[in-house]
Amino acid sequence: MGQHPAKSMDVRRIEGGELLLNQLAGRMIPKGTLTWSGKFPTIDHVLDHVQTMEEINTLQQQGAWPAGAGRRVGLSNPAPQEIPQPQWTPEEDQKAREAFRRYQEERPPETTTIPPTSPTQWKLQPGDDPLLGNQSLLETHPLYQTEPAVPVIKTPPLKKKMSGTFGGILAGLIGLLVSFFLLIKILEILRRLDWWWISLSSPKGKMQCAFQDTGAQISPHYAGSCPWGCPGFLWTYLRLFIIFLLILLVAAGLLYLTDNGSTILGKLQWASVSALFSSISSLLPSDPKSLVALTFGLSLIWMTSSSATQTLVTLTQLATLSALFYKS
């Protein structure tokens, strides 16, 4: 009870061959459901199928399993039958030749004939080298005689936007306005320094212009405020020019000390200025329109405020411009 008869060696060989073929043919079966909606095997599945069939054919040719082992994959007949070749008798061959000859004779001749075209004559002049890119060979070809070498595509000119033009004009006017008021403020600072210089060298009660009693028909005025026509007008602007040169000399000296870094003063001054400019540049907006609006607002405050506030606003404007150059 419960015992099965022993299998023969041939049966075991057939079962082993079937297991081998099932493993090889497993990759040929696509995974998932195949429907008529358009799901096709992937390229990987096709390549696996080709490789598997090559392995199966190789094993089949080598006789790796006995006859009958490949019945599950349709390999019941390992040796394929040869396709029979048609055999022609001499009579049938003669009939075929006669039929082809009659067809050639009865076929109507062609009505349209294409005249033979002569090859293009290339003109090679002495000294021309086609490998060097000369145009002599191409110019003789009819294809290059009617068409330009480089196609030219004409595009209509782009129309300028009114908003961009108006923005550029507005930015230019604001820049001119700021430059004008900065120049006026620099002249005012130079006049105050000139007035301080005159007050050091002259008594407080004698601040009148010394050139107004030389016969010129001008109203009384203080030194440093000479109008046009007074002999002291040129001397006033000469002093302003000297003061401006002294300020530039001091600034150049500070820059020289800063670049060399030979003194502690230069290092401290450079560190303080760098920290100031970095802090100001971090507070500045990155949008150019916001920077223009900030400068314009400072200019309006400068025009409508007192002298002390004007000085602070001017220093703020100079620091802002310096921070912009430092940031860029």
UniProtKB/Swiss-Prot annotation:
<feature type="topological domain" description="Intravirion; in internal conformation">
    <location>
        <begin position="2"/>
        <end position="236"/>
    </location>
</feature>
<keyword id="KW-1161">Viral attachment to host cell</keyword>
<dbReference type="GO" id="GO:0039663">
    <property type="term" value="P:membrane fusion involved in viral entry into host cell"/>
</dbReference>
<keyword id="KW-0449">Lipoprotein</keyword>
<keyword id="KW-0812">Transmembrane</keyword>
<dbReference type="InterPro" id="IPR000349">
    <property type="entry name" value="HBV_HBSAG"/>
</dbReference>
<dbReference type="GO" id="GO:0055036">
    <property type="term" value="C:virion membrane"/>
</dbReference>
<dbReference type="GO" id="GO:0046718">
    <property type="term" value="P:symbiont entry into host cell"/>
</dbReference>
<feature type="topological domain" description="Virion surface; in external conformation">
    <location>
        <begin position="2"/>
        <end position="163"/>
    </location>
</feature>
<feature type="transmembrane region" description="Helical; Name=TM3">
    <location>
        <begin position="283"/>
        <end position="303"/>
    </location>
</feature>
<dbReference type="GO" id="GO:0019031">
    <property type="term" value="C:viral envelope"/>
</dbReference>
<keyword id="KW-0597">Phosphoprotein</keyword>
<dbReference type="GO" id="GO:0019062">
    <property type="term" value="P:virion attachment to host cell"/>
</dbReference>
<feature type="glycosylation site" description="N-linked (GlcNAc...) asparagine; by host">
    <location>
        <position position="260"/>
    </location>
</feature>
<feature type="lipid moiety-binding region" description="N-myristoyl glycine; by host">
    <location>
        <position position="2"/>
    </location>
</feature>
<dbReference type="Pfam" id="PF00695">
    <property type="entry name" value="vMSA"/>
</dbReference>
<keyword id="KW-0472">Membrane</keyword>
<feature type="region of interest" description="Disordered">
    <location>
        <begin position="77"/>
        <end position="123"/>
    </location>
</feature>
<feature type="region of interest" description="Pre-S">
    <location>
        <begin position="2"/>
        <end position="161"/>
    </location>
</feature>
<keyword id="KW-1168">Fusion of virus membrane with host membrane</keyword>
<keyword id="KW-0946">Virion</keyword>
<keyword id="KW-0945">Host-virus interaction</keyword>
<feature type="site" description="Cleavage; by host">
    <location>
        <begin position="238"/>
        <end position="239"/>
    </location>
</feature>
<dbReference type="GO" id="GO:0016020">
    <property type="term" value="C:membrane"/>
</dbReference>
<keyword id="KW-0519">Myristate</keyword>
<feature type="topological domain" description="Intravirion; in external conformation">
    <location>
        <begin position="185"/>
        <end position="236"/>
    </location>
</feature>
<feature type="transmembrane region" description="Helical; Name=TM1; Note=In external conformation">
    <location>
        <begin position="164"/>
        <end position="184"/>
    </location>
</feature>
<comment type="function">
    <text>The large envelope protein exists in two topological conformations, one which is termed 'external' or Le-HBsAg and the other 'internal' or Li-HBsAg. In its external conformation the protein attaches the virus to cell receptors and thereby initiating infection. This interaction determines the species specificity and liver tropism. The large envelope protein probably also assumes fusion between virion and host membranes. In its internal conformation the protein plays a role in virion morphogenesis and mediates the contact with the nucleocapsid like a matrix protein.</text>
</comment>
<keyword id="KW-0325">Glycoprotein</keyword>
<keyword id="KW-1160">Virus entry into host cell</keyword>
<keyword id="KW-0261">Viral envelope protein</keyword>
<feature type="topological domain" description="Virion surface">
    <location>
        <begin position="258"/>
        <end position="282"/>
    </location>
</feature>
<comment type="subunit">
    <text>Large internal envelope protein interacts with capsid protein.</text>
</comment>
<comment type="similarity">
    <text>Belongs to the avihepadnavirus major surface antigen family.</text>
</comment>
<keyword id="KW-1162">Viral penetration into host cytoplasm</keyword>
<feature type="compositionally biased region" description="Basic and acidic residues">
    <location>
        <begin position="92"/>
        <end position="109"/>
    </location>
</feature>
<protein>
    <recommendedName>
        <fullName>Large envelope protein</fullName>
    </recommendedName>
</protein>
<feature type="topological domain" description="Intravirion">
    <location>
        <begin position="304"/>
        <end position="328"/>
    </location>
</feature>
<feature type="transmembrane region" description="Helical; Name=TM2">
    <location>
        <begin position="237"/>
        <end position="257"/>
    </location>
</feature>
<keyword id="KW-1133">Transmembrane helix</keyword>
<comment type="function">
    <text>Truncated S protein may be involved in translocation of pre-S domain through the virion membrane.</text>
</comment>
